[in-house]
Amino acid sequence: MFDFQHQLKILPDKPGVYIMKNSLGEVIYVGKAKVLKNRVRQYFQNSKNHSEKVRAMVKNIAEFEYIVTDSEMEALILECNLIKKYSPRYNIALKDDKFYPFIKITTNEDFPRVYVTRNFAKDGNRYFGPYTNGTAVYEVMGLIKKLFPLRTCKKAIVEGGEPTRACLNYHINLCKAPCAGYISKAEYWEMIDEIINILNGTDTSIIKKLKLEMEKAAEELEFEKAAKIRDRILAIELISEKQKMFTVKEGDEDFIDLYTDEKDGCAQVFFVREGKVTGREHFMIENIGDDPVKEVISSFIASFYGGTAQIPKTIYVPEEIEDQELIEKFLTEKRGSKVWIKVPKKGDKKNLLDMVRNNAKIMLDQFKEKMVEEKELNKSALTELADVLGLDSLPVRIEAYDISNIQGVDSVGTMVVFENGKAKNSDYRRFKIKSVKGPNDYESMREILSRRFSHGLEEVNKIKERNLEYSNGKFCIFPDLIMMDGGKGQVNIALEVLKGFGIEIPVCGLVKDHKHRTRGIILNNEEILIRRGSGLMNLITRVQDEVHRYAITYHRSLRDKRTLHSILEDIPRIGEKRRRNLLMKFGSIDNIKKASMEELLDTPGIDKRAAESIKQYFSS
């Protein structure tokens, strides 16, 4: 039993993060504190000063733990990371949490690649963005590819390395083939420097130079050449124009406001660049309840700017936010220069902030309308499903299973989960078939169902004994309905397995027609036809398509890995760890075969003798 009085008494007088848990060990709230002792004790004192949401949370707290940090800033960063990790019920949850795309230039490579990524990291490479307009970033990348024939492969190419055969991109003028030694590092970097200058928007010498070349070509009556240079100039100008929308400068500003109803809210952000509104984004925030606006916006700003590379100099908000000084310091450190959070009282900036709030209200109303419509459609489909199957209640949680193999090789099983009619990807599970030899789908299904419910019962017992936290369980939640991607045989196997464990869960099968389209449901060894186009047909089709897709994808990945491993296993001095490192670095047998001695030696765990063994194997 958790001793609250003792734990509250020994709380430290230091900054840190506290983690509240319910009786199942599930994390329900994460918070930061300047002084842990003072902040955590407040929750368990007079509840009259608490909001309704906080009172509800405190009732559910069965235990808490804390992490001491060296500073309040560290506590803020850790709080953001833990909220992302656990998605606690009582923390502010962004419904539309987005990771905006960046253009990444791998400047730590001899021959850099340029591509779009949603993962920003301090890894020594150059990033441009984030691009709040996803279409714009791909338009910019398309123009860059037209202008600059850069490599797109993931090969480890170093200057002076062993040349390899040029790929198709070289022959269609989309790559200069540094892999084959057709371009020097210095020449390649001239293109990279041009791209960086264009994306920075700081160097107009490129366009001036091209205009001179175009004029010269025209004077010499080389009109085709002049036209190509003109197209190049137009493309560069278009990139520069698009970049202006996303390059944060000294005078650039973001405007953030919030609109809430009795339960949820919408945060709206307007991006102002060079005095013009160039873009906007909205985020739905669920279960706000009666949380103060200053707390919600403070949490939103920490979350929104926590994963972005660029932060404006000034952020305007409707009122002073909680921990404003700390948040400003946090953003200043990320930006590298002073960031201000201000409250406009009158004038154009106040009017623009009012517009932001009005737009937030419109987006929240539209979102609610859409959610209600989607919820009603799913509820209607689940109600129809319950009627067809004769269930006493709606099957809120559905688990669907499928087997995939080719002639019994690399047999796998998969489980997908739908809750309230929507796919819940975080609960998907994959199984390698261990005990069944050859193509036997029935016994393979018996194995994965036995493993799933065996693990589930074990976890339930561990949770009861407090040896496992509910949030860490993978199989402890049981479904209201099981769907088998197959007919009578698969359904009967599932019923046998459940009976063996003493578990009562309804089971049905999903069958397809001769065109491989979902046709109906198998129940009690009889097929029930479902009307095409109905809400129920749409639901079971989504379930069947998803479990089949997940099974095929997993089987394909295992098959590819097995093919790679089977060849590498024949190479002397290359054990399991070295095989894994080679695959991680080169990605394919072909790339390993083409790798130079230097590239092989640069692979973790590969010494000179192992590298020589690889070269000898592929040259024989």
From Swiss-Prot:
Record keyword Flavoprotein present: no
GO biological process, one term: SOS response
Domain UVR residues, every copy: 204-239
An example Gene Ontology CC term for this record: cytoplasm
InterPro entries for the chain: DisA/LigA_HHH (IPR041663), GIY-YIG_endonuc (IPR000305), GIY-YIG_endonuc_sf (IPR035901), GIY-YIG_UvrC_Cho (IPR047296), RuvA_2-like (IPR010994), UVR_dom (IPR001943), UVR_dom_sf (IPR036876), UvrABC_protein_C (IPR050066)
Domain GIY-YIG residues, every copy: 13-92
Keywords, in A-Z order: Cytoplasm, DNA damage, DNA excision, DNA repair, Excision nuclease, SOS response
Molecular function terms, GO-annotated: DNA binding; excinuclease ABC activity
Compartments, as annotated in UniProt: Cytoplasm
Record family assignment: Belongs to the UvrC family.
NCBIfam families: PRK00558.1-5 (NF001824), uvrC (TIGR00194)
Function comment: The UvrABC repair system catalyzes the recognition and processing of DNA lesions. UvrC both incises the 5' and 3' sides of the lesion. The N-terminal half is responsible for the 3' incision and the C-terminal half is responsible for the 5' incision.
Subunit structure: Interacts with UvrB in an incision complex.
Name used for this protein in its record: UvrABC system protein C
Source organism per UniProt: Clostridium perfringens (strain 13 / Type A)
